[in-house]
């Protein structure tokens, strides 16, 4: 039987159909918002997965190009692997849902979001978060706390829920808020230097709207929800836990209080060896339980240290940033480099400049078709001292790269100001917490070193949180390192300039953040950000005045848009010849702007511009031109005065004296001065050598 529920969000209808699709799924819903439609299916394995120490949740977000009436490009003509945007949307769905599953739940859970129809005014990724939460709540899977999501814009000082395309073009804030009815679960934001107070107000504005969507989900669950399965939760054997903890607690505590990371890890390895020697025979088949007890003991000690003893593992104050060093120009042949070190976290970012034709072409459901500025993030195994095969970028690398990219996007100059494609690559050389925000700092250094005129330098910081079991007691931590991130409750990343915030991403391991925690984290991040920006400015206070000698050079000329066809030529014949002859790259815009780029060949740029100007310049009656004779006849000579533009010098106009034979005065290949005497209705150009000579003589006399 098909059931339907409807509600209104931001003046538009949100509708959910139950029982319409996916009859064999544990839960399947068909959800629409305006003309945007997403199908969500949620399923779980019947038994827990053995031999793992994590919750195997898998979230998929699949865009179908038929949803916007497009056929995929390329030879295959079907959707391939998920796009970067699809991966980012899947991560945005995962983060607010994962903390709300029961602790110790080890069953495989998969949520598949399939985008079926897209109206650009209504974002499918926002609908997918709401639909994923609702599908889980309706299913028999042990997930019982609804999560809602909205997008928030800021136009002319007014907050807008789920802004339309027109509103998104004018907004200075792109914010996604996910929340339960009691607490904020996740925030993603990009903004044009938004101050902390405005950002906090925007988050709270979105939070209030989320409560209405949560109420809608609760109504649906009350009417159509399945009975929940009793979960089988993993828990370490009580006897093992008691004995191991009794034997090792003091040794683990002593190790955890060592401030130096390497020394602490070395001591922990010794403790683990002692535990293994003590219990390997007695609990031969309980290795996983022993590992779980060690982890829980470490976590208990670190959290107590932070929450009750006001002490951090490395001895810093709660609002203190680790020691920072900045360096630029360390690679001789690249266009720009920045090496940023914060404690044991180190990132090297390299900037590369290219022609505008080097933009990334996007083949997705969004209206955006290309990307001129991009940031890629690499996290090799050696950055954490491990050995593993080197593969392509995973979801984490794509997510961290996009986060740092978003932080700097509002600061990148327009293509008119800086006519280059910009690619940044951040190489994580050492990781001990917050490498994504170190990438923001490294990117700023690299851009300044490359001579990119960004509006202002940007920096990023990660804030952490420790809470008591009842969530009543909480402490916000500045610049979390790996151990605080691993055992803590929050990763709150904030990037921006001295003027305001350009990006936020935060998620939690608990059932959401209090309003006061959000405010404290924003304020703490601002103080830390300003401190880091001071260090960056000490290293390189402004963009370099000159580009690297190895960077390409681009010149811009403007022509009449009606003349674009003359530059391109039939089938691209003219422009391809210019490119081949001058070894340049040419990008033509519809408004008549032409960008000419060459790698280390400035003469090629000048030559190409000269040719283009010749092709597009108008012949003016009365003007004198230096032209080349291309053909002679018995009645006159044809002279090319501009590229592709010829005129006729009649035999009577060649000289003051009577001319019997054209070749007596000029030959093919001669360069002569001619004056345009007439352009007839058919565009034919009449020239006079005699008049040109007379005018030049007249100018000499003056």
From Swiss-Prot:
Annotated keywords: Cytoplasm, Magnesium, Metal-binding, Nucleotidyltransferase, RNA-binding, Transferase
Q: Name one GO cellular component term.
A: cytosol
The molecular function GO annotations come to: 3'-5'-RNA exonuclease activity; magnesium ion binding; polyribonucleotide nucleotidyltransferase activity; RNA binding
Q: Which residues bind Mg(2+)?
A: 485, 491
User: Which Pfam families would you find in this protein's record?
Assistant: KH_1, PNPase, RNase_PH, RNase_PH_C, S1
Record GO biological process: mRNA catabolic process; RNA processing
NCBIfam families (alphabetical): polynuc_phos, PRK11824.1
Q: Which cofactor does it need?
A: Mg(2+)
| The name this protein goes by in its record | Polyribonucleotide nucleotidyltransferase
């Amino acid at each position: 039987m098909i059931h339907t529920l409807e509600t209104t969000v931001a003046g538009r209808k949100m509708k959910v159909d139950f029982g319409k699709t996916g009859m064999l799924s544990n839960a399947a819903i068909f959800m629409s918002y305006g003309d945007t439609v997403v199908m969500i299916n949620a399923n779980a394995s019947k038994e827990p997965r053995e031999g793992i120490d994590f919750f195997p949740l898998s979230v998929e977000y699949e865009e179908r190009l038929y949803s916007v009436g497009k056929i995929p490009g390329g030879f295959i003509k079907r959707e391939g692997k998920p796009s970067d945007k699809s991966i980012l949307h899947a991560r945005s769905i995962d983060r607010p849902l994962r903390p709300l599953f029961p602790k110790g739940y080890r069953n495989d859970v998969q949520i598949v979001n399939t985008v079926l129809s897209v109206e650009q005014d209504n974002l499918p990724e926002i609908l997918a978060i709401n639909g994923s939460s609702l599908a889980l709540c309706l299913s028999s899977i042990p997930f019982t706390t609804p999560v809602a999501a909205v997008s928030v814009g800021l136009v002319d000082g007014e907050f807008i829920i789920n802004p339309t395309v027109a509103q998104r073009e004018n907004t200075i804030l792109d914010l996604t808020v996910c929340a339960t009815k009691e607490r904020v679960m996740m925030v993603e934001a990009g903004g044009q230097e938004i101050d902390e107070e405005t950002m906090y107000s925007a988050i709270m504005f979105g939070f209030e709207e989320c409560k209405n969507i949560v109420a809608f989900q609760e109504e649906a669950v009350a009417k159509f929800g399945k009975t929940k399965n009793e979960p089988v939760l993993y828990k370490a054997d009580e006897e093992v836990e008691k004995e191991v903890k009794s034997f090792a607690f003091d040794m683990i505590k002593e190790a955890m209080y060592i401030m130096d990371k390497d020394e602490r890890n070395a001591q922990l390895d010794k403790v683990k060896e002692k535990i293994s020697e003590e219990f390997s025979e007695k609990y031969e088949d309980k290795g996983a339980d022993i590992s779980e007890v060690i982890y829980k003991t470490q976590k208990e000690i670190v959290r107590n240290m932070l929450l009750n003893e006001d002490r951090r593992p490395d001895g810093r104050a709660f609002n203190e940033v680790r020691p920072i060093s900045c360096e630029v120009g360390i690679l001789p042949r690249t266009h720009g480099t920045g090496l940023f070190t914060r404690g044991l976290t180190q990132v090297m970012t390299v900037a590369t400049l290219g022609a505008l034709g080097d933009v990334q072409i996007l083949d997705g459901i969004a209206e955006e078709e290309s990307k001129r500025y991009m940031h890629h993030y690499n996290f090799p195994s050696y950055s954490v001292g491990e050995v593993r095969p080197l593969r392509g970028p995973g979801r984490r690398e794509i997510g961290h790269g996009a986060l740092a990219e978003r932080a700097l996007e509002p600061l990148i100059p327009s293509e008119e100001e800086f006519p280059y494609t910009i690619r940044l690559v951040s190489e994580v050389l050492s990781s001990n917490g917050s490498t994504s925000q170190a990438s923001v700092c490294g990117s700023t250094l690299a851009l300044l070193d490359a001579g990119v005129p960004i509006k202002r330098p940007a920096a990023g910081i990660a804030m952490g949180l420790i809470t008591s079991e009842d969530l009543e007691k909480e402490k916000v931590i500045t610049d979390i390192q790996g151990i605080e991130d691993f055992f803590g409750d929050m990763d709150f990343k904030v990037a921006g300039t001295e003027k305001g915030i350009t990006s936020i991403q935060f998620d939690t391991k608990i059932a959401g953040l209090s309003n006061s925690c959000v405010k404290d984290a924003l304020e703490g991040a601002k103080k830390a950000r300003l401190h880091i920006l001071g260090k960056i400015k000490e290293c390189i206070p402004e963009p370099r005045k000159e580009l690297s000698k190895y960077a390409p050079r681009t010149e811009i000329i403007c022509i009449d848009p009606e003349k674009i066809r003359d530059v391109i030529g039939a089938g691209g014949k003219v422009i391809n010849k210019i490119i081949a002859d001058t070894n340049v790259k040419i990008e033509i815009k519809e408004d008549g702007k032409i960008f000419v780029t060459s790698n280390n060949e400035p003469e090629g740029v000048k030559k190409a511009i000269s040719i283009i100007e010749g092709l597009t310049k108008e012949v003016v009656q009365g003007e004198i031109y230096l032209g080349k004779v291309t053909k002679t006849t018995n009645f006159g000579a044809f002279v090319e005065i501009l590229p592709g533009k010829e005129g006729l010098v009649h035999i009577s106009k060649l000289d003051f004296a009577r001319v019997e034979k054209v070749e007596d005065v000029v030959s093919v290949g001669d360069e002569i001065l001619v004056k345009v005497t007439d352009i007839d209705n058919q565009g034919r150009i009449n020239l006079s050598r005699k008049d040109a000579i007379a005018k030049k003589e007249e100018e000499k006399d003056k």
